């Protein structure tokens, strides 16, 4: 009798579990969000979380997903890869989330992706650009461009638009994002007839770059690539100018933070970086997002706020189109996403689950203003020329 009762209880438990995962069962859509709310990339994590929360609130206010409200389970990984893995493990083993959004940094997404993949829970990163992220499995997606595309755009811009023939590069050897970009930038610049005359390395959090910059200055580069994060780039720019290095600095989307100019100041004038969008784009869709974000958070949204907002909306749209809350059904709906009208551009996932979308090249001008120097599509063709200068984005407030 006891065995029969236990069997019945087990069967009941399984049926209830199925009911909760079926589109008609349960009353919440549970989405795990892991971001760097503190630590070295806190600015990125905070603005990304802001974008995700705003997207969820908009969908919930409109009735939710197929009548169900979205429940965000937001966790701070403290900018640490091992903590990111721990959080995602909890998401899939204890919280039983239906989908996962995160992380901002490639190294942390790479640490977490195998866990989501093994659990067959779809994970969508809004801003991890290292190609290795989506290679972790067919449940892993990204809604941003990838480093080979971004790196090629950076190198092409230096060679074609700036006319540089000699280049040097500063790379964070312990950062997947930085090393991934370095390889593509160097290879593309060389392929286009340029010469890489010097390479120097540093580690995130370093304060003194004088030895590396002294070496690079002696190589007489016409441009210096710095594929790193804003907190290091600002210091590198200041110390480069102090050493009399006047050539343009060029980097990637890791530069995008108001803290960049707060750290580097006028040393950044005449520098350039690739990005996912511009908050000064006149597209009504972009301006609505910017105005809504400003009204809610009191600041202009940076690119990672926009990519995270898009990622959340894309995930919610896929869940709506899925036949159930089963992970495979959501994964299949995500993979079928085509021309989703995001604020960072129309998004389509290719066969590698990477987003196909445009890139903008931002120029930093005196007074901390930004302008769009040109737009580049995934094939690398220039789409548009200069746009009017506009103020740099303000720092995002801490999320409550």
Map each language-model feature to its residues.
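Extracellular/periplasmic bilobed ligand-binding domains
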Residues: 116, 182-274, 384-385, 389-399
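Segments of small-molecule ligand-sensing domains
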Residues: 295-305, 316-370, 392, 397-400
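Extracytoplasmic "Venus flytrap"
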Residues: 32-53, 75-82, 104-105, 170-179, ...
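Short, low-complexity disordered leader/linker segments with a strong preference
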Residues: 1-30, 61, 379-400
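Extracellular/periplasmic periplasmic-binding protein-like sensory domains
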Residues: 237-309, 320, 325, 364, ...
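An alpha-beta-alpha
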Residues: 37, 140-204, 223, 315
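Beta-alpha junction/loop-to-helix N-cap segments that form part of ligand/metal-binding clefts
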Residues: 21-23, 27-28, 43-48, 58, ...
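Hydrophobic alpha-helical segments within soluble ligand-binding/sensing domains
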Residues: 84, 143-166, 179-181, 207-210, ...
């Amino acid at each position: 009798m006891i065995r029969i009762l236990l069997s019945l209880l087990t069967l009941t438990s399984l049926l209830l579990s199925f009911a909760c995962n079926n589109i008609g069962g349960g009353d919440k859509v549970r989405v795990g969000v892991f971001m760097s709310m503190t630590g070295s990339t806190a600015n990125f994590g905070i603005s990304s979380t802001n974008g995700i929360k705003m997207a969820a609130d908009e969908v919930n206010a409109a009735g939710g997903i197929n009548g169900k409200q979205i429940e965000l389970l937001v966790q701070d990984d403290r900018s640490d890869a091992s903590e990111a893995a721990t959080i995602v493990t909890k998401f899939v083993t204890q919280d039983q989330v239906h989908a996962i959004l995160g992380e901002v940094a490639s190294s942390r997404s790479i640490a977490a992706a195998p866990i989501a993949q093994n659990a067959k829970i779809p994970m969508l990163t809004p801003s991890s650009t290292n190609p290795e992220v989506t290679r972790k499995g067919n449940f892993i997606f990204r809604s941003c461009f990838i480093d080979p595309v971004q790196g090629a755009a950076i190198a092409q811009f230096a060679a074609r638009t700036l006319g540089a023939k000699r280049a040097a590069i500063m790379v964070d050897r312990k950062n997947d994002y930085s090393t991934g970009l370095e390889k593509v930038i160097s290879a593309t610049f060389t392929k286009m007839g340029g010469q890489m005359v010097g390479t120097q390395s540093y580690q995130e959090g370093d304060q003194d770059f004088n030895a590396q910059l002294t070496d690079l200055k002696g190589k007489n580069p016409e441009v210096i690539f710095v594929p790193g994060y804003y907190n290091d780039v600002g210091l590198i720019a200041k110390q480069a100018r102090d050493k009399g290095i006047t050539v343009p600095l060029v980097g990637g989307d890791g530069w995008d933070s108001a803290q960049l100019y707060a750290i580097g100041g006028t040393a950044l004038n005449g520098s350039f970086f690739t990005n996912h969008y511009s908050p000064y784009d006149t597209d009504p869709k972009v301006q609505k997002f910017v105005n809504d974000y400003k009204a809610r958070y009191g600041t202009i949204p940076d690119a990672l706020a926009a990519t995270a907002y898009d990622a959340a909306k894309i995930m919610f749209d896929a869940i709506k189109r899925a036949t159930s809350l089963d992970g495979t059904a959501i994964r299949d709906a995500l993979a079928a996403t085509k021309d989703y009208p995001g604020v960072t551009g129309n998004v389509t996932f290719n066969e590698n689950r990477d987003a196909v979308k445009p890139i903008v090249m931002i120029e930093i001008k005196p007074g901390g203003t930004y302008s769009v120097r040109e737009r580049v599509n995934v094939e690398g063709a220039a789409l548009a020329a200069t746009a009017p200068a506009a103020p740099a984005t303000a720092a995002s407030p801490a999320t409550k």
